[in-house]
Amino acid sequence: MARIVMLGACGKMGREISKNLLMHSEHELVGFVDVVNVGQDFGEILGISRLGKTVEDNLKEVILKTNPEIVLDFSRASGAFTNILIALENKVRVVSGTTGFSQEQIKKIEDVSNANNLGCIIAPNFSIGALLLMKLAQMAAKYFSHVEIIEYHHNLKVDAPSGTAIKTAELLSSIRENQPSAIQEEEKIPGSRGGDYRGIKIHSVRLPGLVAHQEVIFGGRGQSLTLRHDVYSRESYLDGILFALKKVLELDRFVFGLDELLF
């Protein structure tokens, strides 16, 4: 069992994961940090009985008061970067599902984590199914010369493309070079062919009713292969989060992506 502070507690992911951890986990949630609903009892925010713990907006003060072992972060990159560094500098391990960090920010977090010999996991996706999709895509990439990625999310997601799509493109580009188009393409509407990551096109869809979905489509001579993963509920992330919470206590270094620990 670990003592955990939830960062970004009042967001959709923060609320869903907090409720599941409170109901189905041996871990103890000792603090809740967010910039909204400050001063309110977190149990009432979740629609359950009062917890006797209110939402606070200063992570360092919460750490000093509650002495946690892990900060679990589902906030936004704009604030998460500073707060992750605060946690590590105060000798608290971090598991983060926040996306949208720059490469420079990730490198800084890695440096601070390693310098303090503290486990820190930043994972673009905690869904075991999504991680398996990426693994299968790596296998398929050895046999197909063309690939594109389509990711679908709810219309309130602020960053595009998703961290999972970027991670997938990174994995694919590390083992193969995407073949350029056989023709000179002309975009009648700029951006209509999607974003480009090292020759791999990524397309982002944002619509109400969606949660999180991704397709990796491979094309070859006379055939295509489509790999798809769908998340219908944020509960799908719980198994991966529990796995990360266990593993981060064993780590003394930075890890990006659960795939390094799973496979």
Curated annotation (Swiss-Prot):
It is found in: Cytoplasm. One of its GO terms (molecular function) is NADP binding. NAD(+) binds at residues 8-13, 34, 97-99, 123-126. InterPro entries: DapB_C, DapB_N, DapB_N_CS, DHDPR_bac, NAD(P)-bd_dom_sf. Pathway: Amino-acid biosynthesis; L-lysine biosynthesis via DAP pathway; (S)-tetrahydrodipicolinate from L-aspartate: step 4/4. One of its GO terms (biological process) is diaminopimelate biosynthetic process. Belongs to the DapB family. This is 4-hydroxy-tetrahydrodipicolinate reductase. It comes from Carboxydothermus hydrogenoformans (strain ATCC BAA-161 / DSM 6008 / Z-2901).
